[in-house]
């Protein structure tokens, strides 16, 4: 016994032995990560891979440092030549970058081979935040957005104009003599958020400060889960550590649902149910997503399955999904327009276009359904901002879900669980697609420049531009194909209206230098501290 005791005492406490064993375990673990976890891409080139003992682990740890410049450089070197390459990830979840020539191949794969649903759930940690999601409710919401909400946007122009004008006037004032300094991000938020909430949830809460605070609290927690659990935490830790880290998000979600969403949804749903059973009932529901989705769920005939909790949870998650990118893009547009050289007269051209498009008739004005479609130059300026500053550097993301994996057109085989995406920032900066791509050219997407001298034969050709929502394999902020962002029409509508109202009603001093964006985990967000000098115009 004494010999055994001495042995265990030695092995338990000898620092040399402990250090040797620990070092061996660490090296073994790193070797397994290098060879197994980071090997699915085979011989594909990696961004930032350098010779060394653990080149791919090192590349992953440097991934955030490489950032957008590294992704653009890799696209130029590989993607622009039709080659697949690998973007390392600080969470040890490398992603295969798909060149533009093979986007169609990705889109043609069935969802049981390359799944957009599984990719989104992993990237946003939705499997932890929405553990009881119902595919029927998901489908109803998507169909409602496509077939009801999008088709009613122009009809609701007056509603949007009411929210944007009320909130911008309150934020910036109506004093035509005094210049004021205003935070750009906060100003945009005050205009966009209420308008977004009004069409998603309804008029009863869109200006409620307590509702805004609770939604903001949940959105911040959701963002925390997305960054930490969805992007930083290694996949094998998500079921345990990820669930623990998502508990704050779940708590804030449940509190928000019980306080706001479930009572509102229950009231609306059962009023519509009574209306469907008794057409003579005196009830006119407000035109918003709650009404349209409730109608669609009732039309399925499966009322028992339509849980107000499940409905509310899906509705609530749409706000942090839609609001940040819409606010970021509107802020970026303002930064870009105010940063253009004075000799381009961008503000003047946009103001004159808006002034010409506005119909001063009492029943028209900002409520005119035809107003926004007439803003061709502004449409181009917004599209150019989204080209230069897409919120997501990678889009069209998919996850390999086929049991046997999938083989790329180039011949490389990818196992189940591999992530793929398209480097949007690389394509958007490709000189072969967009000449002088590094320059913000607000009227790049028009068929001619404002003030351009025309031949007599061309004067009859109207000024046009490519629509903000038009997705192609060279313009990817919204994705591409049938799974492109279904809410892009709403986002574009709110951005265009907000910027148009601001430029028409307020003088804005130009920036000496554009405020810089911050890139975190592939997401490019505008400076939230930058301010602008504004003064109400005298009309």
UniProtKB/Swiss-Prot annotation:
Membrane-topology descriptor: Single-pass membrane protein
Catalytic activity: 2alpha-hydroxyl, 4beta-carboxyl motiol + 4 reduced [NADPH--hemoprotein reductase] + 4 O2 = polytolypin + 4 oxidized [NADPH--hemoprotein reductase] + 5 H2O + 5 H(+); 4beta-carboxyl motiol + 4 reduced [NADPH--hemoprotein reductase] + 4 O2 = 2-deoxypolytolypin + 4 oxidized [NADPH--hemoprotein reductase] + 5 H2O + 5 H(+)
Residues given in the record as heme binding sites: 435
Pathway assigned in UniProt: Secondary metabolite biosynthesis; terpenoid biosynthesis
Biotech / industrial applications: Polytolypin and biosynthesis intermediate compounds show antifungal activity and can efficiently inhibit the growth of the pathogenic funfus Candida albicans.
Localization of this protein: Membrane
GO molecular function: heme binding; iron ion binding; monooxygenase activity; oxidoreductase activity, acting on paired donors, with incorporation or reduction of molecular oxygen
E.C. number(s) listed in UniProt: 1.-.-.-
Keyword annotations of the record: Heme, Iron, Membrane, Metal-binding, Monooxygenase, Oxidoreductase, Transmembrane, Transmembrane helix
SUPFAM superfamilies the UniProt entry points to: Cytochrome P450
GO biological process: secondary metabolic process
Family in the record: Belongs to the cytochrome P450 family.
Function summary: Cytochrome P450 monooxygenase; part of the gene cluster that mediates the biosynthesis of antifungal fernane-type triterpenoid polytolypin. PolE acts as a dual functional P450 monooxygenase which can catalyze the formation of both the 1-beta-hydroxyl group and 10-beta-carboxyl group, however the oxidation sequence of polE has still to be determined.
Protein name in the entry: Cytochrome P450 monooxygenase polE
